[in-house]
């Protein structure tokens, strides 16, 4: 008997309601009297819809990322890669930014579970981290699909989802033995750019019939760093290129079908990521390195992250509805050479001694989904989450020494605690109501309690309305939040500057920046409205969005007091307001049915402004257009052409710190485009080849020390891959 699928037909309702699970926001259930399989909804109908984008395994195979999944996620509507501020520091460590809200407001999930390893990396005075982010823990070949959720629907996922949610879903075990071995290489034409080589395997099958199945995969990857002199010299030093990375991953999943309707998953993962240093110093000032240490470290490993996770997940189907529960543990050891915490040498390696910060996270979730008919067909979701994070970072919390007397803070580092923790408990409910045929109303409410700032309410309302057979309008509004991170709220976290790094409003003296345990959460009111068109495979849509942001946590400008030597005492504080506003558009044209398709999306940023400073929240293109022409030439061979156009990028216009007064660089990055071609050939049933050229016309962007040119856009490169299945 074939399983009967339970579908929610509208993309927004499916994304929000689906299985209604924060641990898997677009899941679907298949069941019959003999078996139950809980899996994700990678339905083609969801692709390129307002607020929801789906990247399938086939999409990844046709345009494989060089190493990091962010490279393909960035091609979704509303998504870019950027730093967490407009400062430009750590410019080549760009992370996923959704709707201009910054990487810290993008919640990354793997199989529905939050990933927080990047939070083990020190948070700088300017709001940046020396991290690659959390989108590189799963090799591309092991991904079943990636779901990108934008807009008000993200409110149900709690802290850190003000921009949106990225859910990376891995391949499930199968009831028959299968395996694969994949090899991939990427070779740049410019010998100053780093090459990449990757190998991984996947093995899955039954251990005891279909009652007990397993999946095991492993991955090893090496990306070389850019040459130390890839960027032109400025002020006696080079802006660093992209650093290299070595990845090693092992992941195991054991799935126990207790009954046909009850499944328990046991999971374990271990990863090691080590960098290959390219010379970045946060402020591109390697000429200030003590004893030329930065220069001697090029090509060496200066930081490495060890990540381990354990998980236990339960899924059940009952006569009355569905249930899900899970407990998870994540431990990250972040080991790196000691870095400065003072002024222009903040973030610069200043020692050959390694220190380790440890971040441990415990999580538990539970929810039920109750379908019923009272006045209208509806499904009510009730759930809870408990999260506890502990950070132990002696190198950051106990680095700054001062002879000044600071209220409540010891000048002796050994007297300051290296630890900080936070507990966040949330409960939520959501009701997916089909008020009339073609009308779905989805009210929601989430309540969170934080051990420091107390309570927070996050209401949301989403609407989907059919307008005849071809058009549909969707709208939503939600209040979303982000809790202070464990550096901002730590009383032991102390940074200092001799004066040049003080806020521009402070004319004299040096400054100390203290942690603040009394911070309130950041708040954003997210709104969107969109119109969709569907007819005979043709699909088009346009969405307007606006996020009104307040209480953004920033390094303080208000002087709390002065030390005996006249130094100014500041602390992390809740700032004023900001606004992000823009348009997203999508278009799908089946040029020749089942043979040739043309898919395009576009993002246009109307406004991105911190109302306190007048500067943008982050440096992103004014507009981005992604287009793909996909041709299924034969049943075995497919080819594609992809093109991305980036609009101009403007840097900050207004000085924020003292040494920028009158000398702030305003050089822009003009619009430019990147074209790629690729092909896939199924040579035999168990042998697949792919190859292509990225950046076909060799458009390169070189990083500069200041302005909007904060990153390297790599030039033409040739890639090839092979996958052997058995």
Regions found by a protein language model. Give the residues of each.
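Short, acidic, small-residue-rich periplasmic hinge/interaction motif at the N-terminus
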Residues: 26-62, 103, 111
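N-terminal periplasmic accessory domains that precede
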Residues: 69-72, 94-97, 109, 133-136, ...
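Extracytoplasmic beta-strand/coil segments of soluble accessory domains associated
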Residues: 70-117
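Short acidic/polar hinge/loop motifs at secondary-structure boundaries
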Residues: 114-150
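C-terminal beta-signal and adjacent terminal beta-strands/loops
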Residues: 116-121, 549-550, 555, 645-656, ...
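Periplasmic-side early beta-strands and strand-to-turn transitions of outer-membrane beta-barrels
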Residues: 174-297, 551, 648
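Gram-negative outer-membrane beta-barrel transporters
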Residues: 182, 434-438, 544-549, 560-655, ...
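Outer membrane beta-barrel strand-and-loop segments of large Gram-negative receptors
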Residues: 355, 361-370, 416-420, 426, ...
């Amino acid at each position: 008997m074939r399983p009967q699928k339970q579908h929610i037909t509208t993309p927004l309702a499916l994304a929000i309601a689906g299985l209604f699970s924060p641990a898997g926001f677009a899941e679907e259930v298949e069941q019959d009297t003999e078996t139950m399989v809980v899996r994700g909804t990678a339905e083609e109908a969801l692709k390129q819809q307002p607020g929801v984008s789906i990247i399938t395994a086939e999409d990844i195979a046709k345009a494989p990322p060089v190493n990091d999944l962010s490279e393909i996620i960035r091609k979704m509507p509303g998504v870019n890669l950027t730093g967490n501020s407009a400062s430009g520091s750590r410019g080549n460590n760009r992370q996923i930014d959704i709707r201009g809200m910054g990487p810290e407001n993008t919640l990354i999930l793997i199989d529905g579970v939050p990933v927080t390893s990047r939070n083990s990396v020190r948070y700088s005075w300017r709001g940046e981290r020396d991290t690659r982010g959390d989108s590189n823990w799963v090799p591309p070949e092991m991904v079943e699909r990636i779901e990108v959720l934008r807009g008000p629907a993200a409110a149900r996922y709690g802290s850190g989802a003000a921009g949106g949610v990225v859910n990376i879903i891995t391949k499930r075990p199968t009831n028959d033995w299968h395996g694969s071995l994949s090899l991939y290489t990427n070779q740049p034409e410019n010998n100053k750019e780093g090459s990449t080589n990757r190998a991984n395997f996947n093995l899955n099958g039954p251990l005891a019939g279909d009652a007990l199945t397993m999946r095991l995969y492993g991955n090893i990857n090496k990306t070389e760093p850019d040459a130390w002199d890839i960027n032109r010299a400025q002020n006696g030093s080079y802006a660093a290129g992209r650093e290299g990375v070595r990845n090693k991953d092992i992941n195991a999943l054991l799935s126990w079908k207790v009954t046909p309707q009850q499944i328990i998953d046991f999971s374990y993962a271990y990863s090691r990521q080590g960098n290959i240093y390219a010379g970045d110093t946060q402020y591109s000032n390697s000429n200030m390195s003590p004893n030329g240490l930065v220069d001697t470290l090029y090509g060496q490993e200066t930081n490495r992250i060890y990540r381990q996770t354990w998980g236990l997940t339960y899924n059940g189907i009952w006569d009355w509805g569905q249930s899900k529960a899970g407990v998870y543990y994540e431990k990250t050891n972040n080991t790196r050479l000691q870095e400065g915490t003072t002024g222009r040498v903040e973030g610069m390696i200043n020692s050959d001694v390694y220190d380790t910060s440890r971040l441990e996270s415990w999580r538990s979730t539970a929810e039920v989904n109750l379908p019923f008919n009272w006045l209208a067909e509806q499904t009510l979701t009730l759930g809870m989450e408990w999260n506890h994070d502990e950070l132990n970072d002696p190198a950051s919390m106990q680095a700054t020494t001062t002879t000044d007397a600071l209220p409540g803070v010891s000048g002796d580092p050994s007297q300051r605690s290296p630890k900080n923790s936070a507990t966040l408990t949330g409960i939520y409910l959501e009701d997916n109501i089909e008020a009339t045929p073609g009308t779905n109303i989805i009210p929601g409410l989430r309540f969170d309690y934080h051990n420091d700032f107390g309570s927070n309410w996050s209401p949301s309302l989403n609407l989907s309305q059919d307008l005849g057979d071809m058009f549909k309008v969707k709208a939503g509004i939600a209040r979303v939040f982000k809790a202070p991170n464990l550096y901002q709220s730590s009383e032991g976290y102390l940074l200092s500057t001799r004066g040049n790094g003080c806020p521009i409003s402070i004319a004299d003296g040096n400054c100390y920046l203290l942690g603040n345990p009394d911070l309130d959460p950041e708040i954003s009111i997210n709104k969107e409205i969109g119109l969709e068109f569907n007819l005979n495979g043709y699909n088009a849509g346009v969405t307007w969005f606006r996020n009104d942001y307040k209480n953004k946590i920033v390094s303080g400008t208000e002087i709390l007091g002065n030390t005996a030597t006249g130094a100014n005492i500041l602390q992390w504080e809740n700032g004023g307001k900001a606004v992000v506003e823009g348009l997203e558009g999508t278009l799908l044209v089946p040029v020749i049915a089942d043979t040739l398709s043309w898919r395009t999306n576009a993002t246009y940023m109307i406004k991105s402004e911190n109302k306190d400073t007048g500067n943008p929240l982050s440096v992103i293109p004014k507009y981005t257009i992604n287009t793909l022409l996909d041709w299924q030439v034969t049943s075995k061979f497919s080819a594609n052409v992809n093109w991305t156009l980036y609009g101009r990028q403007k840097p900050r216009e207004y000085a924020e710190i003292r040494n920028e007064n009158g000398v702030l660089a305003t050089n822009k990055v003009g619009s430019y485009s990147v074209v790629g071609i690729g092909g896939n050939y199924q040579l035999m049933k168990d042998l697949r080849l792919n190859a292509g050229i990225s950046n076909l016309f060799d458009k390169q962007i070189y990083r500069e020390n200041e302005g909007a040119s904060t990153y390297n856009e790599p030039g033409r490169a040739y890639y090839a891959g092979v996958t052997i299945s058995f």
